[in-house]
Amino acid sequence: MDWNKFRLLRATALAMTCGVLLSILTTCSISYKFEGGSINYDKTQTIHISEFPNRTPNYPLLSQVFDLALRKRFIEQTRLREVSSNADIEIEGEITNYQLTPQAVRDGDFASKTRLTISIRVHYINNKESNKDVDQTFSAFRDFDSAQALESVESDLVKQIVDEIVDMIYNATVANW
């Protein structure tokens, strides 16, 4: 009989413990949202992103690739509506650098790696909160094997670099990182 009471008490204690833990877990939650973290949507609802001209003689498609990636990021990850004029936020700038430099030089002055660097100057203007304006140049690079022809890796490298620069711009302007 004592054994049955013990099992009953043990089962009751276990059920109560599980109930308490379950109620704690269902009532407590932590939510992180990194999209448009510093935008005050009560004041700011529109954005205009100008075309970024490519001031370098290389990779003529760079301007289009960058413009599309930047627009996509801001339109998909914020609640801002794109307009052609009188925007609350304006983003403009230019592609200032597209450079290939030798890396890891070895015997006979031959570089086993080549570095592709892209730099983009950005002017971010918040017409509702001017203290959040940003005027900065963002750069990123990727290294590739010098035995590979640039033409065979260029579009993939450009996409990777552009994605990284767009991340940096987004984080420096609206994500508040």
What kind of region is each of these model predictions?
Residues 1-4, 10, 15-19:
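A cross-taxon signal for low-complexity, glycine/charged-rich
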Residues 18-27:
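C-terminal segment of classical bacterial N-terminal signal peptides
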